[in-house]
């Protein structure tokens, strides 16, 4: 493989990596309809807030490329687009990237219909389809640029938190890095300990168009020679950490160790000083206006543990994951998933000799099938436990008053969605159709 790709796209064709088969099988599913995209998202064959939005947007682009709408007028094309997007929204209601992308694509499609300069119905329909397709492809293109920026900002933020070593140290030089303070030409180099981090769930190339958000920061730390070690949780019950993040870390040859979700406290207590564990870095399915963050179940527990051990807790998310229309985490809808995700598990068969047969899989029960199960897919971490939100526009750090101010990095969206103003200063009268992605 030249590189890990969750999504392969060429105009008119979309393939999505079936992540339920990882790490033992590498299989791409052809996605040619919105129904197939819905099923891929709902079944978690594709997951990660950015990837979900991209797959949904591109699946409809594929339909439109092949003219499956069968529209006779431009307004029929817009109606078809809106209906299909509303359907796709139901595949993952917690992920704000999906709802934001849908708002954008509806707006783009309507604008294309209003500005088409032809009286030919066939040409007008084609213009609306093309406007949608170009906008959907732009979401894919901009996601990678966004992730690279998040990685860079996050790595530099964590580097700035490190204290220089005052005296000469003769320990293993591979555990240290040397750098001059930024913007200080000619200043003396200072030596710092490399840092270690813990991450949860999967937020890398498999959850995005490439590089990743939280895992993207880890990639950037490693590339910049700031990273000592990366720890990842298995992330029960779907094991995205053990199946996917561990797979990516090994593939990238990043020094790493897998732990169970319940080992994090012990890891911090025993290894914080030894390994210079400086941060827990997680992604986000939705960040509310006050900084409360919905993410994979188990994130909240890690935030509480990080605070108890004086370890930075960092959320890595594109600005499209920040929901300014949701005041706090209390307003975030959390979906429940099937009980069998806790009581059963699938994997490659291990023979008596210890050999893993990747061509043979089995599903086994690991709990009494009669037990009641509570299986929320996400939890909400209160903003008081979050030190910084890293975006493609830089970091937003929790203030001394315990608040997050996203206005500085998203002034236009803030004016529209919080203050109720249109770009020209007029009051906004609808419920969000003016939403626009920062990178489109």
Swiss-Prot record:
EC supergroup of this enzyme: isomerase
UniProtKB keywords: Amino-acid biosynthesis, Cytoplasm, Isomerase, Methionine biosynthesis, Nucleus
GO biological process terms on file: L-methionine salvage from methylthioadenosine
Active site: 285
GO molecular function ontology, one term from the record: S-methyl-5-thioribose-1-phosphate isomerase activity
E.C. numbers: 5.3.1.23
Catalytic activity: 5-(methylsulfanyl)-alpha-D-ribose 1-phosphate = 5-(methylsulfanyl)-D-ribulose 1-phosphate
Pathway noted in the entry: Amino-acid biosynthesis; L-methionine biosynthesis via salvage pathway; L-methionine from S-methyl-5-thio-alpha-D-ribose 1-phosphate: step 1/6
Record's subcellular location: Cytoplasm; Nucleus
Site keyed Transition state stabilizer: positions: 201
GO cellular component, one term: nucleus
Gene3D superfamilies: translation initiation factor eif-2b, domain 1, Translation initiation factor eif-2b, domain 2
Cross-referenced PANTHER family: METHYLTHIORIBOSE-1-PHOSPHATE ISOMERASE
Family: Belongs to the eIF-2B alpha/beta/delta subunits family. MtnA subfamily.
Function: Catalyzes the interconversion of methylthioribose-1-phosphate (MTR-1-P) into methylthioribulose-1-phosphate (MTRu-1-P).
Protein name in UniProt: Methylthioribose-1-phosphate isomerase
UniProt organism field: Botryotinia fuckeliana (strain B05.10)
Species classification: Eukaryota, Fungi, Dikarya, Ascomycota, Pezizomycotina
